[in-house]
Amino acid sequence: MAKKSNRYSYAPELVALGKAIRLVRLEIGLSQEALALSAEIDRSYVGGIERGEHNLALVNILKLARCLGLSGAQLMHRAGL
């Protein structure tokens, strides 16, 4: 199986952000699908974000943060960034 060539895949910062998104999502009782619908992004993309596989655009970070009840800064803080 071929490896992903995306140079951002699994960067520590993306993994930390993904873990923070997953943790907050679970804390507030949202499924990936519910978060995706609320943020108007695909559910499979949310899964990839939570695994640190996607280099998110700022607009998507802010949309996800808002849907999780956080500001972008609060989400970054939760991720240790």
Give the label of every model feature segment.
Residues 19-38, 63, 68:
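Short basic helix-loop element that most often maps to the first helix and adjoining turn
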Residues 60-65, 75-76:
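Hydrophobic micro-packing sites on short alpha-helices
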Residues 69-81:
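Short C-terminal boundary/hinge segments that cap the last helix of small helical domains
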Residues 40-54:
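Recognition helix of helix-turn-helix/homeodomain-like DNA-binding domains
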Residues 21, 35-36, 46-49, 75:
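Conserved hydrophobic/aromatic packing and binding residues within compact polymer-binding modules
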Residues 1-3:
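C-terminal regulatory/oligomerization modules of transcriptional regulators
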Residues 5-26:
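A short, Lys/Arg-rich alpha-helix, primarily the initiator
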